[in-house]
């Protein structure tokens, strides 16, 4: 048994990719996308028919040029999601424009629009996760959407405060990042020799997982943003792990036995009063790494979103 199959005994494996061929090869349960992956996928030959359909849709909808570009971008993300769903039995995560991360109302409106676009193609909302940045506004938008039956995946999650606020809001799933936390600490003080169990990213996810299970929150914990196979194996047993195709291939080729590292707690603790907005902002602000990486992540996704829109604009 290879490590990928071994990992699947304890954890739901999710493909962090927009490449359909890779997704088919590794047979994950779910798939996650983001503006960076959509931008990369848009250049693949296999997606050209979807790209053309996107442009035709935007032209048909009409409106100003800016409106057409936004409609094309939303439609392309959904078209790729629909195609991915042909190859996974579970769900696909589609991301809300990162530039809306500080506008609760716009996050809700965009999420509803994406769900409607999926439904136009016969995809029920039970197969979709709407990805939102884990800002206070994103978390509150998700709380509202969950009440409408629209499940959300809160991403760019780096601090314990973000995770706790998401759990308290009843968010379906959170994606605490491992690799980007590792990057931040490693750049300041190289983690040498490397010990996976001491990796700050691994430690962060373990703490979040244990807290949510001990306090009986229903939020699914999905570790994300991995740099090394060792990080993945150190979190075997986490509810879900979303993994790049490069690391899926490494796991597929290795046959070392996989041991379960995380298990739900048998203890139960009383849930504390939910964090208020000032408490959330203060607790998050106390984590310099999380402040840096959340801001950077939003900026990076915004740049890739703009690049995608520029690509579409050139064809419209």
UniProtKB/Swiss-Prot annotation:
Alphabetical list of HAMAP family matching this protein: Transaldolase_1 (MF_00492)
InterPro entries assigned: Aldolase_TIM (IPR013785), TAL/FSA (IPR001585), Transaldolase_1 (IPR004730), Transaldolase_AS (IPR018225)
Gene3D superfamilies xrefs: Aldolase class I (3.20.20.70)
CDD domains tied to this protein: Transaldolase_TalAB
Function, as annotated: Transaldolase is important for the balance of metabolites in the pentose-phosphate pathway.
Protein name, per record: Transaldolase
Pathway(s) of this molecule: Carbohydrate degradation; pentose phosphate pathway; D-glyceraldehyde 3-phosphate and beta-D-fructose 6-phosphate from D-ribose 5-phosphate and D-xylulose 5-phosphate (non-oxidative stage): step 2/3
Active-site residues, record numbering mapped to chain: 131
GO BP, one annotated term: pentose-phosphate shunt
Keyword field: Cytoplasm, Pentose shunt, Schiff base, Transferase
Family of this protein: Belongs to the transaldolase family. Type 1 subfamily.
Disulfide bridges in this chain: none
Predominant location category: cytoplasm
Top-rank EC class of the record's enzyme: transferase
Keyword Transport: no
Catalysed reaction, written as an equation: D-sedoheptulose 7-phosphate + D-glyceraldehyde 3-phosphate = D-erythrose 4-phosphate + beta-D-fructose 6-phosphate
EC number of this enzyme: 2.2.1.2
Top-level taxon of the source organism: Bacteria
A GO MF term: transaldolase activity
Oligomeric form and interacting partners: Homodimer.
GO cellular component: cytosol
Subcellular location(s) per record: Cytoplasm
């Amino acid at each position: 048994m290879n490590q990928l199959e071994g990992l699947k005994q304890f954890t739901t494996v999710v493909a962090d990719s927009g490449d359909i061929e890779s997704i088919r090869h590794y047979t994950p349960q779910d798939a996650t996308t983001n503006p960076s992956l959509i931008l990369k996928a848009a250049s693949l030959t296999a997606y050209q028919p979807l790209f053309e359909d996107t442009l035709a849709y935007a032209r048909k909808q009409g409106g100003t040029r800016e409106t057409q570009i936004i409609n094309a971008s939303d439609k392309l993300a959904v078209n790729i999601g629909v195609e991915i769903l042909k190859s996974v039995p579970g769900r696909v995560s589609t991301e809300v424009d990162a530039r809306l991360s500080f506008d609760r109302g716009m996050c809700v409106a965009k999420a509803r629009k994406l769900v409607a676009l999926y439904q136009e193609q016969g995809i029920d909302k039970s197969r979709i996760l709407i990805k939102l940045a884990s800002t206070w506004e994103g978390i509150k938008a998700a709380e509202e959407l969950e009440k409408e039956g629209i499940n959300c995946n809160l991403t760019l999650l780096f601090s314990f405060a973000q995770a706790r606020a998401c759990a308290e809001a009843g968010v379906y799933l959170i994606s605490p990042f491992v690799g980007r936390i590792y990057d931040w600490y490693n750049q300041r003080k190289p983690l040498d020799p490397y010990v996976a169990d001491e990796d700050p990213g691994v430690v962060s996810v373990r703490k979040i997982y244990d807290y949510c299970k001990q306090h009986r929150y229903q939020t699914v914990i999905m570790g994300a943003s991995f740099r090394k196979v060792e990080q993945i194996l150190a979190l075997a047993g986490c509810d879900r792990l979303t993994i790049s195709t490069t690391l899926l291939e490494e796991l597929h080729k290795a046959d070392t036995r996989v041991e379960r590292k995380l298990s739900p707690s048998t203890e139960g603790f009383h849930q504390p009063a939910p964090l208020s907005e000032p408490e959330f902002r203060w607790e998050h602000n106390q984590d310099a790494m999380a402040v840096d990486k959340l801001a950077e992540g939003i900026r990076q996704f915004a740049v890739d979103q703009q690049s995608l829109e520029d690509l579409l604009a050139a064809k419209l």
